[in-house]
């Protein structure tokens, strides 16, 4: 994430516009542009923990991680630069939150790759700001307008839920598999045939569906759930609460904030960061797993069959097995073996 994205390069084409402004960056920001941006003031609201990590050393208290922006973070900001995310519903949720706090007259810049659906920004915000396209470059569009009216925003109204067996799953915009259980997670769950116990880490927990379903089958599991998405963290907490399941839920960029070792790590790892294909998280998950598993501990993941995970698993663990597969997905498992005995050490 060190290089600038095409969307940020489009913003820099208009850098003179922002020199005297107090700018708030928000949305699917994936680079360090705010840390080097020339403006009278720069603040960032992000709901992605790894983006917060990237920027916090430089911007310190001027970057906020969380589901909802606060009036304190947005104080004194007169300009919003919003990066359009992959999910239209997520854009609606975030912009409704931001524009309900920013004062009337705030300049709004919306930027995003054309394939992300940024063109729909004009229609989406029509009741609150009249946006017009002011630039098109690098397969991106940049739109500008001023806030004419603040929208009403009630975070509780954005919650949705669905059922998986006897489990109620609570979800928010931007959370993976918001509307129903995805087929990859379904295949992963099908490989748990017997009750088990011990400590289990769910990396990239989404709405907490894996832990909640497995907790019904194996109530003695000690769960830790993690995700980079603030929406996923809140959704997981809500799912666990409504199903009366106790677990620790934390923000972590794969293992960045994980303490201790586990009997098992499970995951349906993402291979996108926003709309960009990225195997970084999955590679970190596999390569770092042995440092977070007990001897005999297992990493069990589901992934699209075409992704190059077998070689990564073999490099990290020495071997792997395929527990289940269908036309699209495979469930892989790898086990931490005992280290070879050093023949030089005395018995």
From Swiss-Prot:
Designated name of the protein: Ribosomal RNA small subunit methyltransferase C
Enzyme class, spelled out: transferase
HAMAP family per the UniProt record, alphabetical: 16SrRNA_methyltr_C (MF_01862)
Highest taxon listed in the record's lineage: Bacteria
Location within or outside the cell: Cytoplasm
Entry's EC annotation: 2.1.1.172
Predominant location category: cytoplasm
Gene source species: Yersinia pestis
Listed GO biological process terms: rRNA base methylation
GO function terms (MF aspect): 16S rRNA (guanine(1207)-N(2))-methyltransferase activity; nucleic acid binding; rRNA (guanine-N2-)-methyltransferase activity
Role: Specifically methylates the guanine in position 1207 of 16S rRNA in the 30S particle.
Taxonomic placement: Bacteria, Pseudomonadati, Pseudomonadota, Gammaproteobacteria, Enterobacterales
Sequence similarity: Belongs to the methyltransferase superfamily. RsmC family.
GO CC, any one term: cytoplasm
Catalyses which reaction(s): guanosine(1207) in 16S rRNA + S-adenosyl-L-methionine = N(2)-methylguanosine(1207) in 16S rRNA + S-adenosyl-L-homocysteine + H(+)
Assembly information from the UniProt record: Monomer.
Keywords linked to the UniProt accession: Cytoplasm, Methyltransferase, rRNA processing, S-adenosyl-L-methionine, Transferase
Coiled-coil features, chain-numbered ranges: none
């Amino acid at each position: 994430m060190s290089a600038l994205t095409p969307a940020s390069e489009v913003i820099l084409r208009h850098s003179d516009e922002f020199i005297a402004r107090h700018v708030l960056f928000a949305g699917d920001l994936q680079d360090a542009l705010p840390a080097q941006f020339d403006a009278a003031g720069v603040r960032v609201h992000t709901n992605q923990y790894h983006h917060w990590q990237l920027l916090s050393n430089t911007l310190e208290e001027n970057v906020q991680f969380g589901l909802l922006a606060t009036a304190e973070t947005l104080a004194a900001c007169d300009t919003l630069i919003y990066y359009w995310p992959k999910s239209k519903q997520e854009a609606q949720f975030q912009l409704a939150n931001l524009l309900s706090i920013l004062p009337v007259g705030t300049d709004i810049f919306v930027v995003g790759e054309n394939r992300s659906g940024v063109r729909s920004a004009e229609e989406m915000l029509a009741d609150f700001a009249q946006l017009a396209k002011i630039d098109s470059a690098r397969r991106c569009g940049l739109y500008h307008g001023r806030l004419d009216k603040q929208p009403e925003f009630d975070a509780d109204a954005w919650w949705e839920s669905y059922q998986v067996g006897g489990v109620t799953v609570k979800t928010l915009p931007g959370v993976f598999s918001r509307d129903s259980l995805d087929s990859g997670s379904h295949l992963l769950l099908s490989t748990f045939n017997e009750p088990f116990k011990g400590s289990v880490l769910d990396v990239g927990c989404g709405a907490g569906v894996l832990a909640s379903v497995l907790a019904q089958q194996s109530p003695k599991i000690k769960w830790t759930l993690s995700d980079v998405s603030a929406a996923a963290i809140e959704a997981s907490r809500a799912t666990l609460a409504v199903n009366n399941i106790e677990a620790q839920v934390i923000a972590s960029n794969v293992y960045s904030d994980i303490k201790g070792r586990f009997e098992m790590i499970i995951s349906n790892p993402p291979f996108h960061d926003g709309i960009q294909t990225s195997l970084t998280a999955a590679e970190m998950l596999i390569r770092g797993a042995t440092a977070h598993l007990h001897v005999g501990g297992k990493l069990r993941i589901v992934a699209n069959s075409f992704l190059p995970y077998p070689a990564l698993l073999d490099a990290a663990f020495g071997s792997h097995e395929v527990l289940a597969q269908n036309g699209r997905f495979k469930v892989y498992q790898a086990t931490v073996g005992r280290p070879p005995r050093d023949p030089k050490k005395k018995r």
